Amino acid sequence: MKLTCMMIVAVLFLTAWTFATADDSSNGLGNLFLKAHHEMKNPEASKLNERCLDAGEVCDIFFPTCCGYCILLFCA
């Protein structure tokens, strides 16, 4: 009985936490569809088209775009 109550409380807590920390609960699916439509019209806007940097190329520590890791401003 205690375990069941604890599980119910945990599920309720996690559900409330999910709703409280959601980015945008209003029209969330609509925004996703608009973004997908924009990416279909403009393929360059898609994140799938971004090229990762090969080993030895210069990278940025804060926004690394390496295929592997960014170590001391160079891709590894």
Curated annotation (Swiss-Prot):
Any one GO cellular component localisation term in the record: host cell presynaptic membrane
Subcellular location: Secreted
InterPro entries recorded: Conotoxin (IPR004214), Conotoxin_omega-typ_CS (IPR012321)
Keywords for the protein's UniProt record, in alphabetical order: Calcium channel impairing toxin, Disulfide bond, Ion channel impairing toxin, Knottin, Neurotoxin, Presynaptic neurotoxin, Secreted, Signal, Toxin, Voltage-gated calcium channel impairing toxin
GO molecular function, one term: calcium channel regulator activity
Disulfide bridge map: 52-67, 59-70, 66-75
Residue ranges of the propeptide: 23-51
Tissue: Expressed by the venom duct.
The keyword Signal appears for this protein: yes
Signal peptide: 1-22
Pfam families: Conotoxin
Purpose of the protein: Omega-conotoxins act at presynaptic membranes, they bind and block voltage-gated calcium channels (Cav).
Family to which the UniProt record says this protein belongs: Belongs to the conotoxin O1 superfamily.
Domain notes per entry: The presence of a 'disulfide through disulfide knot' structurally defines this protein as a knottin. The cysteine framework is VI/VII (C-C-CC-C-C).
Protein name: Omega-conotoxin-like TeA61
Organism in which the protein naturally occurs: Conus textile (Cloth-of-gold cone)
Organism phylogeny: Eukaryota, Metazoa, Spiralia, Lophotrochozoa, Mollusca
